[in-house]
């Protein structure tokens, strides 16, 4: 039910969910079962769920992968962005994503229509729904779309929180929703503390564990801008003193 052109791009997103679940040295990952309200471990090829954690890769520091979703990067910045992206990704990340080092198609900027189409396409393939969010998984998604679709990864960012995090790029239909994760076993030496169910809250400045949720209404309502215009700075249309005061009141750093 995506927009026209989705069928032509059905092949690239095949296996995206498996790549997001896959971690270096492990064959499983985790997602949140909203029906059962519990963590499920997906074992590749087994089709079974287990209430046991698996391990995720190293934590990606917030701010290392900077996005500017409210504007398209200038043509001259594409080269520097590409170099930054390659510098940020190590060999383990390339193995994890499983896509070519060189993009299959020419690089292009994300657009509203492209974001909307890719959102529906990923939903049809079950790529993000219920997956725990982490900085590393966001990188995997960015790299995957760049290599397969040529989409420069200077677009994927969300509102600061706490609570539901709305995408700042209008047309991207995936938001981040906080969930409660049982903490029993956290103090056990055998408990895997580097699973995304555990590390997501450490990546988040508010200590919340987040999962991706598809929201088709985001195609028509720019919730990020409506609810939090101050996060867009000078692009918000607010007086500078006002948007800075709002950011300061929410504890969000600004320059």
Swiss-Prot record:
Residues 87-95 are annotated as: Acidic. Residues 87-96 have a biased composition (Acidic residues). A lipid is attached at residue 2 (N-myristoyl glycine). It is a lipid-anchor. A motif (PxxP) lies at residues 103-106. Coiled coil: none annotated. It is found in: Host cell membrane. Residues 1-100 are annotated as: Disordered. Residues 40-53 have a biased composition (Polar residues). Keywords: AIDS, Host cell membrane, Host membrane, Host-virus interaction, Lipoprotein, Membrane, Myristate, Viral immunoevasion, Virulence. GO terms for cellular component: host cell plasma membrane; membrane. It comes from the Viruses. It holds the Pfam family F-protein. One of its GO terms (molecular function) is GTP binding. Signal peptide: none annotated. The keyword Lipoprotein applies. Residues 139-155 are annotated as: Mediates dimerization. Residues 8-20 have a biased composition (Basic and acidic residues). Homodimer. Interacts with host CD247/TCRZ; this interaction induces down-regulation of cell surface TCR/CD3 complexes. Factor of infectivity and pathogenicity, required for optimal virus replication. Alters numerous pathways of T-lymphocyte function and down-regulates immunity surface molecules in order to evade host defense and increase viral infectivity. Alters the functionality of other immunity cells, like dendritic cells, monocytes/macrophages and NK cells. One of the earliest and most abundantly expressed viral proteins. In infected CD4(+) T-lymphocytes, down-regulates cell surface expression of CD4, CD28, CD3, and MHC-I or MHC-II molecules. The N-terminal domain is composed of the N-myristoyl glycine and of a cluster of positively charged amino acids. It is required for inner plasma membrane targeting of Nef and virion incorporation, and thereby for infectivity. Belongs to the lentivirus primate group Nef protein family. This is Protein Nef.
């Amino acid at each position: 039910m995506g927009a026209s052109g989705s069928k032509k791009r059905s092949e690239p997103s095949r296996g995206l969910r498996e790549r997001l679940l896959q971690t270096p040295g492990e064959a499983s990952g985790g997602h949140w079962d909203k029906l059962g309200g519990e963590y499920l471990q997906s074992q590749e090829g087994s089709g079974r769920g287990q209430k046991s954690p698996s391990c995720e890769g190293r934590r990606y520091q917030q701010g290392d992968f900077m996005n500017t979703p409210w504007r398209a990067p200038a043509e001259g910045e594409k080269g520097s962005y590409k170099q930054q992206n390659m510098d940020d990704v190590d060999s383990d990340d390339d193995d994890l994503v499983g896509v070519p080092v060189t993009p299959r198609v020419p690089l292009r900027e994300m657009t509203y229509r492209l974001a909307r189409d890719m959102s529906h396409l990923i939903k049809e393939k079950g790529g993000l729904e219920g997956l725990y969010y982490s900085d590393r998984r966001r990188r995997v998604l960015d790299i995957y779309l760049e290599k397969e679709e040529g989409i420069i990864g200077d677009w994927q960012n969300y509102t600061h929180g706490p609570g539901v995090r709305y995408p700042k790029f209008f047309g991207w239909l995936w938001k981040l929703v906080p969930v409660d994760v049982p903490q029993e076993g956290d103090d056990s030496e055998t408990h895997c503390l580097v699973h995304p169910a555990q590390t997501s809250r450490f990546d988040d400045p508010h200590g919340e564990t987040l999962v991706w949720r598809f929201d088709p209404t985001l195609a028509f309502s720019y919730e990020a801008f409506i609810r939090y215009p101050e996060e867009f700075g000078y692009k918000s249309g607010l007086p500078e003193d006002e948007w800075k005061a709002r950011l300061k009141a929410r504890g969000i750093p600004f320059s």
